[in-house]
């Protein structure tokens, strides 16, 4: 363990997907964690709050004594067994608390008493977090090329095919539109930023990187927003625009939002509950933009959606969804994106069908 306890290269730890046994309270972990970290707290939220109050009123020694009283006996043993099991599963892992202080040192000492020598992250999560922020800022200074195009143009697929492509929507677990949620909940803002930083570091380490290829995104992807340093660079970046036939875009959207999402919901929850969740997902997507559609148009499209769902449930056909998807694209999504693109017209360096854009990227 001695070599692992020397001055730590935080970037190397992140690049290596180093397992982290994060002993912070669940609320701290939920607010922000590193990719692949597992949360096995020394103290739960109420215990941590009690110790914090004691620290403010009576000082460090009293708080430490209270912590040991709260985490003792069977509770201590149960948590110790969980840490031991985690270390046996991840023998190259590290302990991590907020700043590399009391909590990780206490767990390290308790493990050592059982014969396990587990290193800890010096500086804790805060040090790793700062490394992630600095890495994103530094790597965002490299040239960026954006892939643009209306909804259903296959932009995400194109980005994923590039060795220097960064799938921002995949990292955010959201596809950007009001229908963009997936079955996986979005990460907290800090966790999303940490995951993005690690992805940038990994791609940069794999190759001599001339530039990043990213999808042309707004400030936010669902509940997550892009780091300002990256957003500022994207605002100035050149754009290659995918211009595919409307019918081809419809087929991509049919596959993504009706066929695949129905499959994913029923696979996760079973036929009946999955159908209910799928139906609610589509209704929620439409409801989210009701004010922009106008309440009368929203009501009309909702009725059409209900009929399409009834048809899909009875026959399996998704054709009925085109009756509300087509006007939604024509009246809302396409005009909105084209308006946004017009403001960046000077940045457009290439236009063409999906395959032409793919070939152009390959030639760069």
Curated annotation (Swiss-Prot):
Domain Rhodanese: 14-137
Gene3D superfamilies, sorted: Rhodanese-like domain (3.40.250.10)
Catalytic site: 97 (s-selanylcysteine intermediate)
Group of enzyme by EC: transferase
Domain of life from the UniProt record: Bacteria
Key words of the record: Selenium, Transferase
EC nos: 2.9.1.3
A biological-process GO annotation: tRNA wobble uridine modification
Calcium recorded as keyword: no
Keyword Repressor listed: no
Known partners and oligomeric status: Monomer.
Annotated function: Involved in the post-transcriptional modification of the uridine at the wobble position (U34) of tRNA(Lys), tRNA(Glu) and tRNA(Gln). Catalyzes the conversion of 2-thiouridine (S2U-RNA) to 2-selenouridine (Se2U-RNA). Acts in a two-step process involving geranylation of 2-thiouridine (S2U) to S-geranyl-2-thiouridine (geS2U) and subsequent selenation of the latter derivative to 2-selenouridine (Se2U) in the tRNA chain.
PANTHER family tied to this protein: TRNA 2-SELENOURIDINE SYNTHASE
Family: Belongs to the SelU family.
Protein name in the entry: tRNA 2-selenouridine synthase
Organism: Salmonella paratyphi B (strain ATCC BAA-1250 / SPB7)
Organism placement in taxonomy: Bacteria, Pseudomonadati, Pseudomonadota, Gammaproteobacteria, Enterobacterales
Gene: selU
């Amino acid at each position: 363990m001695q070599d692992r306890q020397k001055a730590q290269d935080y970037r190397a730890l992140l690049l290596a997907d180093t397992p982290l046994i994060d002993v912070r309270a669940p609320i701290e972990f939920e607010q922000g964690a590193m990719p692949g970290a597992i949360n096995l707290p020394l103290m739960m939220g109420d215990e941590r709050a009690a110790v914090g109050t004691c620290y403010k009123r009576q000082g460090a020694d009293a708080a430490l004594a209270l912590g040991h009283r709260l985490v003792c006996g069977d509770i201590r043993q149960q948590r110790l067994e969980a840490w031991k099991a985690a270390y046996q599963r991840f023998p190259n892992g590290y302990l991590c608390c907020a700043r590399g202080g009391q909590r990780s040192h206490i767990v390290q000492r308790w493990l050592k008493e059982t014969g396990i020598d587990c290193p800890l992250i010096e500086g804790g999560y805060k040090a790793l977090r700062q490394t992630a922020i600095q890495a994103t800022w530094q790597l965002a200074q490299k040239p960026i090329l954006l892939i643009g195009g209306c909804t259903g143009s296959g932009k995400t697929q194109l980005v994923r095919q590039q060795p220097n492509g960064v799938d921002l929507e995949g990292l955010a677990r959201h596809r950007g539109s009001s229908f963009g949620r997936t079955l996986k909940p979005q990460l907290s803002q800090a966790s999303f930023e940490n995951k993005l930083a690690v992805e940038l570091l990994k791609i940069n380490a794999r190759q001599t990187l001339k530039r990043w290829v990213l999808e042309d995104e707004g400030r936010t992807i669902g509940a997550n927003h892009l780091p300002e340093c990256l957003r500022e660079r994207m605002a100035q970046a050149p754009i290659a625009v995918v211009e595919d036939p409307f019918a081809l875009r419809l087929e991509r959207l049919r596959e993504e939002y009706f066929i695949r999402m129905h499959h994913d919901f029923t696979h996760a929850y079973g036929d009946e509950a999955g159908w209910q969740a799928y139906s609610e997902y589509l209704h929620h997507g439409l409801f989210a933009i009701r004010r922009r559609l106008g309440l009368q148009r929203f009501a009309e499209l909702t009725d059409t959606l209900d009929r399409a769902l009834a048809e899909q449930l009875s026959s399996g056909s998704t054709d009925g969804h085109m009756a509300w998807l087509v006007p939604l694209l024509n009246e809302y999504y396409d005009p909105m994106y084209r308006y946004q693109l017009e403001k960046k017209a000077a940045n457009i360096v290439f236009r063409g069908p999906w395959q032409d854009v793919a070939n152009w990227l390959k030639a760069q």
